[in-house]
UniProtKB/Swiss-Prot annotation:
Species of origin: Pneumocystis carinii
Entry similarity comment: Belongs to the terpene cyclase/mutase family.
Top-level taxon of the source organism: Eukaryota
Organism ancestry: Eukaryota, Fungi, Dikarya, Ascomycota, Taphrinomycotina
Keywords per UniProt: Isomerase, Lipid biosynthesis, Lipid metabolism, Repeat, Steroid biosynthesis
Descriptive protein name: Lanosterol synthase
GO cellular component, one term: lipid droplet
Pathway annotation from the record: Terpene metabolism; lanosterol biosynthesis; lanosterol from farnesyl diphosphate: step 3/3
PFTB repeats mapped onto the chain: 118-160, 478-523, 555-595, 604-645
NCBIfam families per record: squalene_cyclas (TIGR01787)
Catalytic activity, EC: 5.4.99.7
Catalytic activity: (S)-2,3-epoxysqualene = lanosterol
Active site per database record: D451 (proton donor)
């Protein structure tokens, strides 16, 4: 029951009409077929039925009696979720501030909302509203915030829900309790300002002039973390020009609905630093407040038109580079939505750039049984496919006649997904080399990612080392991948996400976003470092003559980073999934590559003791997302999670933990949660980024459970 509505009473589309259109490059878009004739010509696949929450009509199987039977049964189900081009698709959702950017951009640029999109976005937001107070958080499991509530309220109003609808009324009450939209963090203020529901003078300056500073300055945006600079580039361009939507009746109404006082009475300039306490994750530092005061003075007094024009022109040139080098996908959905507005206001609705962005919107939208969301990228195609391959090879099932064709298709996808060309004007657009890299999603998105490159390289090597598999990726291309990985090692020995660390650590003191942590520069991560170590070690075992001394040095330095970043309790903190369990699994895998195991390694022993001490009474492991936000291990309130349990078991097995008992208990829990058709049900959210925002990785419940079961079977045999 949601605000007096049951799920059946919410307006919804017919789930029989949805189809996932997949291209051989990994591109995926949902399309709604309206006629019975269209639907008969293209019946729904098992995969589509699964994503829509429909009955797949797969036969039930007897409960698995051994871990390898469970792994086989799991992949017998999971193979049905593989797309026609060989990758594993899924939602990449859970983030509640992405849809508002797209919907606001569409509204301002007059892009029509298809009925099926309007209906399903409303349904998604209603389904994910806080059941107690009616608001929305920064992610689906988070508490209600001004950021989430104000922006998603705007979305519902744009899409047709009136201010007196039970859903909007309850959300507005919660927003008022939180102090109204005046307490939005900076990104929320930006979206309200472009919609003409907030004054530009109430936002701390976001100036495109930063891009014109000398590049040797530590504060130059090219030294920022890639996602941060990608967002603040178009944001700064629009702020610099003060583009805003013309006032219409809806905007006039929203102006009064979003605030606790009349809109005309608000002095926005006094609220540049007003952020609701419930939203603040990283408060403004004194250093940032001083910089903002200086920038405000400059912007108000000394920003001459010729400077503004020069800065805007340069910023827009960089926007064009981003569009070109990502085939109009952009690095992610936040800057994608801002780019829609930038090209609309600069080039107009009939321009090639605007039409290209419009055509790309479907790449980010995902339909589920709860409605339509906006994914955190254009998918997780490469990332999840790499782990699926590794799980099957680790389990000894890759050459199984039932599964081999699926692995060949996966290898074909990995082959097509590798980036084989550097960006044009690479230095001018501040991009790292990408020839030989693999991305997170698709080749067209085009960004080098360290762990994606490493995990994909490992997956390719594992398959191509099996005699019965074709050699799709040439030796020269494998060497290109190794070159990319080696180019990404930081001075501390660790590996970051997209690039080398370019800026000084003190840049984190000028983080303006308020809701995210560690976003100003790259940081070295245990997960990315482990991916690099394992890939390099496996490559070295097969091709020891290529850059051998450099690989040896790289691995040595990376392992030293892993050891030095271990916490006193034996764990590691990770920034891309939840959290200490995930990081500790990867760190133990790294240590195993250099034969550091429980019996001979102090670091491995401490890590194993940490994991074993966190085991639940039922044999599983349980860790909540607050571990990420608070930096302290926190138990998940619902108890053991199959994904967390798989991670812990995998880590202990990599470490050759001498007592089989805790591992066996974990494996038993994984097997007990398996459904008669072979699947595992979705449990708590798995991923995180920027410390404070959670994101879904639903394929982890297949990739890591199958891997854990297969590893156990190889090491211990049957239970």
């Amino acid at each position: 029951m949601i605000y007096g509505y049951t799920e059946k009473e919410l307006e919804k589309t017919d789930p029989d009409g949805w189809r996932l259109i997949v291209e051989d490059t990994g591109r995926q878009r949902w399309k709604y077929l309206k006629t019975e004739e269209e639907r008969r010509e293209r019946p729904q696949t098992y995969m589509e039925k699964y994503f829509l929450g429909k009955n797949m009509d797969l036969p039930e199987q007897p409960a698995a009696k051994t871990p390898i039977e469970s792994a086989r049964k799991g992949f017998s189900f999971y193979k049905h979720l593989q797309t026609s081009d060989g990758n594993w698709a899924c939602e990449y959702g859970g983030v509640m501030f992405l849809l508002p950017g797209l919907i606001i951009a569409m509204y301002i640029s007059k892009i029509e909302f298809p009925d099926e999109m309007r209906i399903e976005v409303i349904r998604y937001l209603v389904n994910h509203a806080n059941p107690e107070d009616g608001g929305w958080g920064i992610h689906i499991e988070g508490k209600s915030t001004v950021f989430g509530t104000a922006l998603n309220y705007v979305v519902l109003r744009i899409l047709g829900l009136g201010p007196d609808h039970p859903v909007t009324m309850k959300a507005r009450i919660r927003l008022n309790e939180l102090g109204g939209a005046i307490g939005c963090p900076q990104w929320g203020k930006f979206w309200l300002a472009v919609l003409n529901c907030y004054g530009w003078e109430g936002i701390n300056p976001i100036l495109p002039e930063f891009w014109m500073l000398p590049e040797w300055l530590p504060i130059h945006p090219s030294r920022w973390w890639v996602h941060t600079r990608a967002v603040y580039l178009p944001m700064g361009y629009i702020y610099g020009e003060k583009f805003t939507a013309p006032v219409d009746p809806l905007i006039e109404s929203l102006r009064e609905e979003l605030y606790t006082q009349p809109y005309s009475s608000i002095n926005f300039s006094k609220h540049r630093n007003t952020t609701s306490p419930v939203d603040v994750y990283v408060p403004h530092t004194r250093f940032l407040r001083v910089i903002n005061s200086i920038l405000t003075f400059y912007h108000t007094i000394f920003r001459f038109s010729w400077i503004k024009d020069m800065a805007s022109k340069y910023a827009y040139k960089l926007i064009e580079y981003e569009n070109k080098n990502t085939d109009f996908l952009c690095i992610g959905p936040v800057n994608f939505s801002i780019h829609i507005l930038a090209v609309y206001w600069k080039e107009g609705p009939d321009s090639y750039a605007f039409k290209s962005h419009k055509e790309r919107m479907a790449d980010f939208l995902w339909i589920s049984k709860k409605g339509m969301m906006m994914n955190g990228t254009n998918g997780v195609q490469l990332w999840d496919t790499s782990f699926a391959v590794q799980a099957l090879v680790e389990s000894g099932l890759a050459e199984d006649p039932e599964f081999k064709d699926h692995m060949i298709k996966a290898l074909d996808f990995l082959d097509k997904c590798q980036i084989q060309k550097n960006c044009d004007d690479q230095q001018k657009c501040y991009r790292h080399r990408r020839k030989g890299a693999w991305p997170f999603s698709t080749r067209q998105q085009g960004y080098t990612v360290s762990d994606c490159t490493a995990e994909a390289l490992k997956a390719v090597l594992l398959l191509q080392n099996l005699k019965s598999f074709p050699k799709r990726v040439s030796y020269d291309r494998l060497k290109d991948s190794v070159d990319v990985i080696l180019s990404l090692q930081n001075k501390d020995g660790g590996f970051a996400s997209y690039e080398l660390i370019r800026g000084p650590s003190w840049l984190e003191f000028i983080n303006p976003a308020e809701v995210f942590g560690d976003i100003m520069i790259e940081h070295s991560y245990p997960e990315c470092t482990t991916a690099a170590v394992t890939a390099l070690c496996y490559f070295r075992s097969l091709c020891s003559h290529y850059r051998g001394p450099e690989i040896n040095k790289s691995v040595k330095n990376a392992i030293q980073f892993i050891k030095e970043s271990q916490r006193p309790d034996g764990s590691w903190y990770e920034s891309w999934a939840i959290c200490f369990t995930y990081a500790t699994m990867f760190a133990l895998e790294s240590l195993s590559c250099v034969k550091d195991f429980y019996e001979n390694s102090f670091h491995s022993r401490r890590a194993c003791d940490f994991l074993v001490n966190k085991q639940e009474e039922d044999g599983g492991w349980s860790e909540g997302y607050q571990s990420c936000t608070d930096g302290i291990w926190t138990r998940h309130p619902t108890g053991s999670q199959v994904v967390q349990t798989a991670w812990a078991c995998i880590g202990l097995m990599y470490a050759n933990y001498p007592d089989e008992t805790p591992i066996k208990r974990g494996i038993n829990l994984i097997m007990s949660r398996q459904q008669p058709n072979g699947e595992w049900k979705q449990e708590a959210i798995e991923g995180v980024f920027n410390k404070n925002c959670m994101i879904s990785y639903p394929n982890y419940k297949f990739n890591f459970t199958i891997k854990a079961l297969g590893m156990y079977s190889k090491r211990y045999g049957n239970i």
